[in-house]
Amino acid sequence: MRFSTPIEISPLPFQLTPQSHIVVLGSCFAEHIGQRLERALPPDRVSVNPFGVLYHPTVLARALARIAFAHPLPEDIFFEGRDGLWHSWWHAGAFSAPTREECQRLVEASLNQAHEVLQKADLLILTLSTDHGYYLKEELSCGSLVANCHKMPSKMFEEKVTSLEQSIGVWESLLPFIKAHYPQLRILWTVSPYRYAKHGMHESQLSKARLQLMIDHLIHSKTANDNPFLQISGSKVSTQSLERRKKMSEIFGETSEIFENILESMLKRSNDFTQYSERDQESTENYSKKEKEERKDAATSSFTSSVDTWQFYFPAYEMLLDELRDYRFFASDMLHPSEQAVDYIWEKFRETVFSSDLNDCASHPYSIRQALAHRPLHPESDDYRKFYTKTQQRIAEFTQKYGFAPQ
């Protein structure tokens, strides 16, 4: 007899190891999973919500673009709130500070740390929560969509639902750049199990459905998985990348200069690729079609992803609503998952993506921390000295095996 509907999780073609680097972006649920990853790996190998908790797909895309290409943040995202603190329209309240300088220092330090981790990352976890966005009625150069309202007056904002087509357009414009610049990276999408009662349960379900449709489209979309650079077709160069950069500029409320800079920095990775830019089109017209294809393949090889399939979906949302279909798995507000539910989903996540080495690595620090936390009744006794020596030996063996000390 069965009393639940187990969710089948498709096997993934990769596993995380003790040497892995991971970036986690998104909702409160992303924060919960990220904190557990931080206990399994050294802090410098995991970056969890470097912009704070984010919910909206476009806000996540904007944050990822900044992290991926380390472009300076706009000046007008910073403002002084009603509480006397300085905030950022692009960040959660965790970065608020008494002065503008301190707020800016905090967000820049977090951005730089996330960029460093992403350079080596095996996995990027993206957790979406809602497509309801809040827009400033007064347009700023940094765009009007905010990550957090920071308890400012509601009359300053307009709530809008982002259409499925708009959300897809945002990510189809960005993902090819991410894939080209980070060929080793894989993306694991999830949808937050949190339900938005303030929108009504029906609209909450519709919002989650749109996010799931967006993710499914992106995983299978040719546009989201192609090469973002100019392509050769006969003797002509298409303007696909120019159109994409224009689209990204519209999305993020900036001029195309940022994306020109991104493209230039990526082009530097290949000395030969510049011959396929528009300004060099004439110089390639004398080549035969075969020669052009050979030269193009050589030039773009460094932008080819080292993984065949790079986007995947993890069914955290389905686990809570179907497999754990009981109010005992919800927090007291009946909307958030309980700690027990998060632990259950985390264990399923571990079973899916952790290698045996990482599972072994993640289990040791807990027992070592317990040993270090032990307060002996007789610290001068032979038994405690043996216990202490054995604990230090375990720490040394762990460090030698995995290359870092247990946290």
Language model: regions and residue ranges:
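Active-site segments of SGNH/GDSL-like serine hydrolases
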Residues: 5, 131, 176-205, 315, ...
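A cross-taxon signal for low-complexity, glycine/charged-rich
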Residues: 235-250, 254-257, 270, 275-278, ...
